[in-house]
Amino acid sequence: MEDFVRQCFNPMIVELAEKTMKEYGENLKIETNKFAAICTHLEVCFMYSDFHFINEQGESTIVELGDPNALLKHRFEIIEGRDRTMAWTVVNSICNTTGAEKPKFLPDLYDYKENRFIEIGVTRREVHIYYLEKANKIKSEKTHIHIFSFTGEEMATKTDYTLDEESRARIKTRLFTIRQEMASRGLWDSFVSPREEKRQLKKGLKSQEQCASLPTKVSRRTSPALKILEPMWMDSNRTATLRASFLKCPKK
């Protein structure tokens, strides 16, 4: 699974997933399914915000790469993928600026058009079951929930899907591609089945001492509005590279 993740996802996403697992004391060489799940979730969050801007009239607009209007304000602030300290700093800054209610748990995105935090879910199970789990955990009507599955299903708070159909279809296509690529390598069943995952985890624990620790580079993200907090984590060239890789999943 680890080899698949490194081949299928952009190196910047892999790097962020490595950092996240290290922050929580998890070993990606043992918990490979979690490694794959984190990378998938990160990519969906990036794709959710991709190309979406707000124009001078405060309306949402979709801008393709290379368009001179790309200097418009980003519609979504990406919170997922930051270290916890920086993530809460961003959340606090958003709340102070917009008057939004501070969430109990770290959300994944903030939507400047709808003025709400968004929790993104990617599930291998039934979307309605995962949605209810998220809702019961968050216990806040202020945070919008949007769940995607690998089968093309989705569920959102009050059936408000936030994005246009084409943007959501791009996310669903990517998830379906990941599922197909996993299946072609015989990885999908273990990714879906908790029992098989536990068996793989137990097997990995026995060989834990043989696993070399993975060096992790710290990589941070922030929007132009928060440049006073720290430098931009990614310039336009790196952003373009990341976007161009979204639908690529090379085979072995």
Curated annotation (Swiss-Prot):
GO terms for biological process: viral RNA genome replication; viral translational frameshifting. It holds the Pfam family Flu_PA. It is found in: Host cytoplasm; Host nucleus. The keyword Cell membrane does not apply. This is Protein PA-X. The record marks 195, 198-199 as: Important for efficient shutoff activity and nuclear localization. The keyword Hydrolase does not apply. InterPro entries: PA/PA-X, PA/PA-X_sf. The record marks 28, 65, 202-203, 206 as: Important for efficient shutoff activity. The lineage of its organism: Viruses, Riboviria, Orthornavirae, Negarnaviricota, Polyploviricotina. The probable endonuclease active site in the N-terminus and the basic amino acid cluster in the C-terminus are important for the shutoff activity. The C-terminus acts as a nuclear localization signal. The C-terminus is recruited to host protein complexes involved in nuclear Pol II RNA processing. The gene is PA. It comes from the Viruses. Plays a major role in the shutoff of the host protein expression by cleaving mRNAs probably via an endonuclease activity. This host shutoff allows the virus to escape from the host antiviral response. Hijacks host RNA splicing machinery to selectively target host RNAs containing introns for destruction. This may explain the preferential degradation of RNAs that have undergone co- or post-transcriptional processing. GO terms for molecular function: RNA binding. It comes from Influenza A virus (strain A/Henry/1936 H1N1). Belongs to the influenza viruses PA-X family. The active site is at 80, 108. Keywords: Decay of host mRNAs by virus, Eukaryotic host gene expression shutoff by virus, Host cytoplasm, Host gene expression shutoff by virus, Host mRNA suppression by virus, Host nucleus, Host-virus interaction.
